[in-house]
Regions:
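Secretory targeting signatures
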Residues: 1-25, 233-270
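Aromatic/hydrophobic beta-strand junction motif of beta-rich domains
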Residues: 39-47, 146-152
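Intrinsically disordered, low-complexity Pro/Gly/Ser/Thr-rich segments with frequent PxxP/GP/PP motifs
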Residues: 60-91, 168-198
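Membrane-proximal extracellular "stem/stalk" segments
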Residues: 116-235
Length: 270
């Protein structure tokens, strides 16, 4: 259970493999703002190949408003790039969800990943609702259903918004709910939808929520992974093949045991 989530630092990992090399990016957000300070965000590459032509776009999650564009020529293995992101929080008080859409090139292929960041403005403001029990399941070969629940620790009814943070190719209608209401000390279930990846890569994303109370904004995030349909099917096929092999072995052992029992009975009768 993600109770309160007083997040000042969020790390999220993106992994891609192309040819013989890999790019493994970890994004780290440190942000406790006052007087409209910038958001400090770093991307480290722990893979074996460079991420080149890196472009970062920053967005406020609940408006999808572009707040800035940044770039660096490459992030080599074992190195990190540091970005100072302009904040649009201003003098507003509370916690706010931003996300950074990062596009990079590995070999001749271009990849896109997202990194969420909870920005604390004028102090730390933990949310009184948490995101829980999130599952991601395929509906068909193109669509995933994201189910979960929200639990309220507040003595008052909370009204807010909830959304998925995803790379653009995974976004679709039904990825956002507005105007949810959670009763005091109760669960509220939600369902969101995402497109499944067309390429055989696993994507990271997030469920984010936001609400306001007495002039202060509160936010929370929950990291998710979306696996391509083919990868999920291949994994299922692998399990089915293993189960079939085990069943065949058991049948063979039972037949051998039966033959031995019959031979013993014949020997006794003779």
């Amino acid at each position: 259970m993600n109770r309160f989530l007083p997040i000042l630092l969020i790390s999220m990992l993106a992994y891609t493999a192309y040819a013989a090399g890999t790019v493994t990016l970890t994004g780290t957000c440190r942000s406790n703002l006052s007087n409209n300070q910038s958001i400090n965000f770093s991307i480290a590459n722990s893979g074996t190949e460079s991420a080149s032509s890196v472009v970062l776009q920053s967005y406020y999650a609940f408006s999808n408003k572009l707040t800035g564009t940044y770039s660096t020529s490459q992030i080599s293995p074992g190195h990190a790039a540091l970005f100072d992101i302009n904040s649009s929080v201003g003098n507003n008080t509370g916690s706010f969800v931003y996300y950074f859409l990062v596009t990079y090139q590995q070999g001749t292929q271009i990849f896109t990943v997202v990194f969420p960041c909870v920005v604390q403005s004028h102090g730390t403001h933990p949310a009184l609702i948490g995101i829980n029990n999130v599952t991601v399941n395929d509906i068909n070969s193109t669509t995933a259903k994201v189910n979960g629940s929200i639990y309220s620790f507040s003595s008052n009814t909370i009204n807010g918004n909830i959304t998925l943070i995803l790379p653009p190719e995974l976004e679709r209608n039904g990825s956002r709910i507005s105007g949810f209401a959670v009763n005091p000390y109760q669960y509220h279930n939600f369902t969101l939808y995402a497109n499944l990846p067309s390429q055989n890569n696993t994507y990271s994303g997030a469920v984010a929520l936001e609400y306001s109370s007495n002039g202060t904004t509160y936010s929370s995030v929950y990291i998710i992974k979306i696996i391509p349909y083919s990868a999920g099917q291949n994994q299922l096929k692998g399990y089915l093949v293993q189960a079939a092999i085990i069943i065949v072995i058991v049948i063979i052992l039972l037949l051998v045991l039966r033959q031995r029992i019959l031979r013993k009975k014949r020997a006794v009768q003779e």
